[in-house]
Amino acid sequence: MDKLEIAQYLLEQVGMPQKQHSTLCCLALLAMAKLTKETPCVQATNDWVRIHDIISFIGEHYGVIYAENSRETFRKQAMHAFRTAALIEDNGKATNSPNYRYRITTEFLRVIQNMNEADNVVCEENVCLVQFVSKH
């Protein structure tokens, strides 16, 4: 599986609505985890990021260019739903603050890092995924 398929698989497994299985949402999740096409899932991170950082990462590493004025689209289609599902959290600043940031929750980071990419097969036995789904 490639990284987009892995992201889509994770979003499906945690019960995200079909609308959040879109390319935009999958790329946003990968960018937040700082996963390029070559980076193993075990190296995923949960650093604080702005939507601008997400858009830049996607353009640089996946070749998909989004205009800066699409930040609100990312916020509405991905971030709100991800936050509601406890996949990500924000830093509590005002949304119009230049210091407003998002990051993947520690719990969901463990899910991503425990994805088995060996032999291009996603491991169905991701214990962290099972635990995450059972709590949310």
Residue ranges, per PLM feature:
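Short, compositionally biased low-complexity segments
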Residues: M1-D2, R50-D53, V130-H136
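Generic structural signal for hydrophobic core residues of well-folded globular domains
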Residues: M32-T36, I58, A86
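Short acidic, hydrophobic short linear motifs in intrinsically disordered regions
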Residues: E38-A67
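Short alpha-helical segments that sit at the start of domains
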Residues: M1-W48
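Short, amphipathic alpha-helical interaction segments positioned at domain boundaries
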Residues: N91-G92, S97-H136
